[in-house]
């Protein structure tokens, strides 16, 4: 049965270069390795997952360079009929809100499960293993035909003291095929036991048929605090609220007209009242297989009155498959910015990408250029990957 073990993975190398006439150049290379060994052992219930990257900064003077590496995942897991166990650097199963160097246990029935995890929390700045940061949590999850939901309580520590404690919940609901709702919520608990709403996302989409859809949403984001590991635990609360309404309409099975309006309000103690509100409008049209040429085209325009500034932007992007393995993409944009009483600033950008996609090999080359009033930025991004 050991012969049934399966190994999959990806090896990739990415090279990024940007040259800016105002701030100089930047050059970096990133290598990444991802491995997934599944159906291991005589029971075929063991697996090993590994994901790591190494970044080499080549922007230094006199050919000097700096390295930055990190391991995102390195875990050994057992997946039984009802019991799941994992050890290593991991994201808790069905509740990937914290990464830990530790253990995770999850017991589940046909629809509902309960899990617990505990371990060392990687250093948030370097992602290295350290005993200074810790994390533990207890969570529940449910996956039904119409409802999926989860709830968790998380404790983060720093050198033996409480760094952060918070509640987290998420859910999706499809009461009828044409209606879909989603949301998640985070509430932080202070050392004194007070509970404050930190983040809230709620969205409702109504799609009565294959032609049109309407979406309404609300977001709230508040700065949360680390009470032990930073010097800024007494920073004033700041909050940002956003409401948005979007709609799409399909024409002749080829074209889609869409629009979105969004308003935001900031509650920042240090910000003047005239800089607290934002209103944005965006509209566009996209088309598939234009004139039977295989070309996809998207045109959009947006107008934003944002915190004492105004933005107008017009953009396009188009793509076409060249045979079965190549895809060509071209894009461009023009933006006009007005900051208060100052004169307007214009920015023009354009670029293109070429993708090669095969069973095991994927390669891409991307070029773009951005032109402002007093600067020019050019970027080149190349990437090659091999699928095992």
Where are the model-predicted features located?
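Gram-negative and organellar
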Residues: 2-388
């Amino acid at each position: 049965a050991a012969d049934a073990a399966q190994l999959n993975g990806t090896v990739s190398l990415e090279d990024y270069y940007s040259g800016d006439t105002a701030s100089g150049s930047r050059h970096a290379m990133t290598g990444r390795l991802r491995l997934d060994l599944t159906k291991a052992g005589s029971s075929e219930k063991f697996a090993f997952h590994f994901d790591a990257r190494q970044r080499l900064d080549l922007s230094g003077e006199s050919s000097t360079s700096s390295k930055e590496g990190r391991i995102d995942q390195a875990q050994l897991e057992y997946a039984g009929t009802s019991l799941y166990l994992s050890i290593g650097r991991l994201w808790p199963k069905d509740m990937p809100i914290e990464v830990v160097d530790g253990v995770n246990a999850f017991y589940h029935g046909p629809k509902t499960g309960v899990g617990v995890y505990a371990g060392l929390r990687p250093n948030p700045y370097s992602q290295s293993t350290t005993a200074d940061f810790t994390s533990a949590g207890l969570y529940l999850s449910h996956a039904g035909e119409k409802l999926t939901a989860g709830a968790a309580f998380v404790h983060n520590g720093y050198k033996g003291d409480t760094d952060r404690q918070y509640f987290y919940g998420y859910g999706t609901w499809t009461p009828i095929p044409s209606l879909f709702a989603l949301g998640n919520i985070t509430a932080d608990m202070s050392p004194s036991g007070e509970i404050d709403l930190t983040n809230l996302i709620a969205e409702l989409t109504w799609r009565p048929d294959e032609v049109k859809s309407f979406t309404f949403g609300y977001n709230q984001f508040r700065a949360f605090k680390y009470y032990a590991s930073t010097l800024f635990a007494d920073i004033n609360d700041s909050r940002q609220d956003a409401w948005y309404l979007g709609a799409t309409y399909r024409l002749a099975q080829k074209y889609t007209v869409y629009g979105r309006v969004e308003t935001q309000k900031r509650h920042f103690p240090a910000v003047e009242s005239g800089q607290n509100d934002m209103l944005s409008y965006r509209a566009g049209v996209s088309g598939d297989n234009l004139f039977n040429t295989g070309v996809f085209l998207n045109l959009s325009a947006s107008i934003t009155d944002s915190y004492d500034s105004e933005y107008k932007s017009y953009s396009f992007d188009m793509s076409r498959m060249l045979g079965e393995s190549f895809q060509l993409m071209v894009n461009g944009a023009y933006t006009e910015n007005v900051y208060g009483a100052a004169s307007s600033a214009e920015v023009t950008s354009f670029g293109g990408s070429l993708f090669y996609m095969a069973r095991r090999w994927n390669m891409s080359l991307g070029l773009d250029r951005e032109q402002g009033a007093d600067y020019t930025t050019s970027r080149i991004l190349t990437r090659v990957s091999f699928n095992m």
